[in-house]
């Protein structure tokens, strides 16, 4: 029996369709070990399951098994010297993103930990993860110099523009008129073409146009909303890191909270953590009816993974005003300037704690990006909150 580098088997991933491989992933996470494979190429679904949970090694042989530690699932540590030979190496090895205990005082023994995703280098957001996974897979079959494109509310467009360029592709991003200014400007800085549709009320309303243009012009529509590499990037990255960090940090992890955009990162976090411990709570946050919070949307607008996976979750609603109240509270409690989608998740968790709906323990809030991108919203929030001495 032996352990083989999983990178030698990545070519089998594209042959796996659908979500049936996730049953293998769930079983490995629940049992804490994987069985040995006589011929890994003859079991592509099992190989993909190991890849998606973050294993770097495959157990090869007969009648044996290996633990998650032996598979490399726990092999996450930032190089002490923080020296990287390339930007992509920085992205890959500059992990995990920090998990920080907040000083916020929530009722009923609920302790808040902030997963700071603005430590991803390209877009300063969680969207780097799907952008790298999508483009790296695409690079195995699409000629360099090709045009890649997608609809975005802002962060994914920045990430796509940067990552596409690093892999030798041209990028185009489509944005609704209400997108944040950084989302319109930074892709141009990164060499991408930017198309803003002032008539589109939201990002998803741009998808028919992107699909039509892709058919007519022949570019690659990467489609973050329905590309399973999005969900799988968060399984390998965001969710796995929360699992490893909570174990290493000695957290009594009782739940995870986060906002819904494509549903990629929170579907992955819920699936991964509930596979390890089915009692883990997942609080998923959407804007209140008739309200708008940058980067997130309501479930009924159409989300793939949250509706396809066997996960348990509580859906919470938050207004933009409430989200920005939480941004102010975290800034004054912790000195950390989180974005409105992170504020929405903090506020939702606080509401659930106040209602007595959460067990005492540690709860991780995924903070997708930084509030430095949303200064007009911060200014409006301060007019309501006032100064604090």
From Swiss-Prot:
Modification N6-(pyridoxal phosphate)lysine occurs at: 127
Annotated thermal dependence: Optimum temperature is above 90 degrees Celsius for S-sulfo-L-cysteine synthase activity, 70-80 degrees Celsius for O-acetylserine sulfhydrylase A activity, and 80 degrees Celsius for both cystathionine beta-synthase and L-serine sulfhdrylase activities.
Stated pH dependence: Optimum pH is 6.7 for O-acetylserine sulfhydrylase A activity and 8.1-8.8 for cystathionine beta-synthase activity.
Biological or metabolic pathway of the protein: Amino-acid biosynthesis; L-cysteine biosynthesis; L-cysteine from L-serine: step 2/2
Binding site for pyridoxal 5'-phosphate: 155, 261-265, 341
PANTHER family, sorted: CYSTATHIONINE BETA-SYNTHASE (PTHR10314)
Protein's recorded name: Protein CysO
Organism: Aeropyrum pernix (strain ATCC 700893 / DSM 11879 / JCM 9820 / NBRC 100138 / K1)
